[in-house]
Amino acid sequence: MAFIRKKQQEQQLQLYSKERFSLLLLNLEEYYFEQHRANHILHKGSHHERKIRGSLKICSKSVIFEPDSISQPIIKIPLRDCIKIGKHGENGANRHFTKAKSGGISLIFSQVYFIKEHNVVAPYKIERGKMEYVFELDVPGKVEDVVETLLQLHRASCLDKLGDQTAMITAILQSRLARTSFDKNRFQNISEKLHMECKAEMVTPLVTNPGHVCITDTNLYFQPLNGYPKPVVQITLQDVRRIYKRRHGLMPLGLEVFCTEDDLCSDIYLKFYEPQDRDDLYFYIATYLEHHVAEHTAESYMLQWQRGHLSNYQYLLHLNNLADRSCNDLSQYPVFPWIIHDYSSSELDLSNPGTFRDLSKPVGALNKERLERLLTRYQEMPEPKFMYGSHYSSPGYVLFYLVRIAPEYMLCLQNGRFDNADRMFNSIAETWKNCLDGATDFKELIPEFYGDDVSFLVNSLKLDLGKRQGGQMVDDVELPPWASSPEDFLQKSKDALESNYVSEHLHEWIDLIFGYKQKGSDAVGAHNVFHPLTYEGGVDLNSIQDPDEKVAMLTQILEFGQTPKQLFVTPHPRRITPKFKSLSQTSSYNASMADSPGEESFEDLTEESKTLAWNNITKLQLHEHYKIHKEAVTGITVSRNGSSVFTTSQDSTLKMFSKESKMLQRSISFSNMALSSCLLLPGDATVITSSWDNNVYFYSIAFGRRQDTLMGHDDAVSKICWHDNRLYSASWDSTVKVWSGVPAEMPGTKRHHFDLLAELEHDVSVDTISLNAASTLLVSGTKEGTVNIWDLTTATLMHQIPCHSGIVCDTAFSPDSRHVLSTGTDGCLNVIDVQTGMLISSMTSDEPQRCFVWDGNSVLSGSQSGELLVWDLLGAKISERIQGHTGAVTCIWMNEQCSSIITGGEDRQIIFWKLQY
């Protein structure tokens, strides 16, 4: 209904809105070329002669006369039904009525349509039999040209083959476009600079309108060839918020421009004749928008949805948009799922799983008996096989739901007729039952079922939609017993869509429609295979030489529905919901979630202080800085009370700095090689450091000496972690090792027990590791850009994701353990879903990001240039750049309350940062 509201808004603002004519009066794939003011002469030459004033429209397949008086019907004469076309009075016919200056055009035909009499939207009336109509143009000098045009179009309409008809009409259209160009006088400002101009068609539901596209340094223009519905459509580039490349007829020819963030309907949809023209225009607008608008991907929206920052409804709208679904293209209208299974109860129980449809199955597989019949036919079918002959979304299905608010669109689609009364959208329950039991009915729903506008359920236009077999007239849609009104029905449908059950299972439906079960063997296994022509890449129209075959295929593509563009090729992650106590499958991943403090919803994870700190992270200010090392700082750890700061450096020293006295208290050297990281054991009695000399050193703070040395690797140790008496060490020897570290019986004595529990082998050097909150999962980053997620309960590799083009600098789990963030020398910040291993967000900076801390939504990273960058992952943007070090930021520490931050850098400094509240 978004396109209906858009049209109504435009009509309210424009003088031409009083016209009854619209492009919907044309046949599908028909063009409107020109109009002439004229009189329709009735009873020419008799005493009863009278004139009806109006406009004569010349179209590629018909002649349409729109009387000025709404009491008179619009007249549509198909050119294929014309017997003779000529100037009135030629060949002796009615010659004595023809004056020298007559502007008469005579049409003799066998069939005529009468439309919108008294401006009432109703099925077209048809009159058959040989008739002659005479139209007298206001400009007599135009008669000859108009007659010549009509004769040419008549020849095209009478060709035997549909492909030949289309080819000839296309040639006529292209000739007209070639003889015209964009009128530069239509520029908003004389100083505008023209960037490019090309031919295109403006796409609206069921119709296209050819013309010229022009883009300048400030505006995008479209000038229709026929001047309808207005001389020029103008969009200010500064107002553009979103722009998408579109498939049109499975061809890469479409471009859709939005001037709003959330509106379902765009400001203009253009179809180009050449892909290069589309790409050039897209590039120009995208370049203009680059510094004004953040670009969103399916992965970035997924992250927002998982985190609860997008509702299920909003997420589905975004996925539809990214998958080429548009309200301007009814063959690719946004598709939404049936959610509710119960349409018979008096009360709707959203706490009962039985209330809901099984979202893991396509509609065609919900009925077991029907599915068995379909599978039998599928097995017997020659290649290419398909299970369902009709699609889950098509122009017919969209208008089936919207006929009460979009009757003219239905009449356009069905050649001037409404559907049989018993086959119309009469009842929610009947429609659902037919989707379950019908032999060829597998349709899903549209966004309107989860919106706020009830008009598609109510016959507010008082349309005569026919009488059913039982004698009742088709009127408002019959609602289920649990809905007291259309408003109540939509509200409960929205509640169902946003329910916990749907939130926990919506990813299964996304897998079918937008994801990995859409194509290939996974689609076969999910009983989700449709006709090949519905899929992108199913046919190359440019390779088809037979014009009839090409037109037939294009017609099938446009009229029988198209499968959305595939957005995901791996299983879609689940949503994080407050009710998420355990996942349905049993795995170590689930065990880690059960033990994790991230078990609750994301909002429950953060205490008030953490939330306050991250909300003000962009206000970070440099408080104090100290140069305490001779080389780059590599690690920072702080005592629990915050008084002592321990740092490691490439100068091979561990240093202890007093925050209170602001003085260096100790400097310890274990070898002549760099130290790479450090951490404090619980109790603040021992510091552990890793070294490039292949060892891990234990230092007793109380006794001021090296307590123990673990010689466990064959190359430099790059990073260490500790949890629950277990040491995790990463090394350039391509391993991560897990050790048990039994505490010493007496403080200061040596640790004698370092048992190797597991060895996680890699193909290349490991540069960084991190544990999740429960220490059941470990993530490692390698020299060649691979991020690996390990299950520590079984010491097995869960996922290996090659997501960086250089060294992985740092990795960390989100507080709820559901995502991993990684940074690299390639400047990328990548977010990975732990359950599926899917890369769900990737942002890029112009320099390497060496280290970071994050809360799941925002990231504070240290860059190669010395800046601290604040990233908004959900908004996919850099929120703030904060000056700090004079060299690369190499390490960053944040306390548990997120109130204290310390960074170290290649400039040999440690910097204490202050949050401004």
From Swiss-Prot:
Chain positions of WD repeats: 628-658, 670-700, 712-740, 761-791, 803-833, 884-914
Q: Where is the BEACH-type PH domain?
A: 189-286
Q: In which tissues is it expressed?
A: Ubiquitous.
Q: Which SMART domains match?
A: Beach (SM01026), GRAM (SM00568), WD40 (SM00320)
Assigned keywords, A-Z: Repeat, WD repeat
Q: Which InterPro entries match?
A: BEACH_dom (IPR000409), BEACH_dom_sf (IPR036372), BEACH_Domain (IPR050865), GRAM (IPR004182), PH-BEACH_dom (IPR023362), PH-like_dom_sf (IPR011993), WD40/YVTN_repeat-like_dom_sf (IPR015943), WD40_repeat_dom_sf (IPR036322)
Q: Name one GO biological process term.
A: positive regulation of amide metabolic process
**The organism's place on the tree of life at top rank:** Eukaryota
**GO CC annotation: what is one?**
membrane
Q: Name one Pfam family in it.
A: Beach
In this chain the GRAM domain maps to 176-247
Q: Where is the BEACH domain?
A: 290-575
Function of the molecule: Couples the p55 TNF-receptor (TNF-R55 / TNFR1) to neutral sphingomyelinase (N-SMASE). Specifically binds to the N-smase activation domain of TNF-R55. May regulate ceramide production by N-SMASE.
- PANTHER family xref list: BEIGE/BEACH-RELATED, PROTEIN FAN
What protein name is recorded for this chain? Protein FAN
The source organism is Homo sapiens (Human)
